[in-house]
């Protein structure tokens, strides 16, 4: 649906922003192009384009000491899950070599797993590769402050001003 079409645009902007603002990340990916896929997954983990999902509990359950009744509305934070320090050491660090970057839950999990996740991942990776190939001197425009991703659905920077 619309999320599968819009997500690669947001994900590409977020991936490029992280590559351009994390010391050594862009240089590592340029030196080892095989890292682009992992860098995309790491950016999907750290800055998911959709940060929360709404669900209804199908059974009563206790999570971290909180009781949730069957039928209750639950808001799931993908952004928080993707920064779980029990799963991702140094969870707030963008690491293009993170061994388990693909273990993120940006595309949900289980029966609600995004059916377009593979397409979104391939499109994002292709867009990042194309940008890096087309603009070897790509960098943030120094006359503008580095943007920050914003929003809870289609989260991305409002603008990514670059020069090359």
What are these model-predicted stretches?
Residues 1-164:
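Cytochrome P450
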């Amino acid at each position: 649906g619309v999320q599968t079409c819009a997500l690669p645009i947001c994900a590409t902007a977020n991936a490029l922003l992280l590559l351009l603002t994390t010391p050594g990340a862009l240089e590592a990916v340029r030196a080892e192009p095989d890292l682009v896929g992992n860098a995309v997954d790491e950016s999907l983990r750290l800055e998911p384009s959709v940060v929360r999902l709404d669900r209804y509990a199908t059974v009563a359950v206790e999570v971290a000491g909180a009781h949730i009744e069957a039928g209750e509305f639950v808001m799931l934070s993908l952004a928080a899950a993707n920064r779980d320090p029990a799963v991702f050491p140094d969870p707030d660090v963008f690491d293009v070599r993170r061994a388990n970057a693909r273990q993120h839950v940006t595309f949900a999990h289980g029966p609600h797993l995004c059916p377009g996740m593979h397409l979104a991942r391939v499109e994002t990776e292709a867009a990042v590769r194309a940008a890096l190939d087309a603009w070897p001197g790509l960098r943030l425009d120094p006359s503008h402050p580095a943007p920050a991703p914003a929003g809870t659905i289609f989260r991305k920077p409002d603008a990514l001003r670059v020069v090359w």
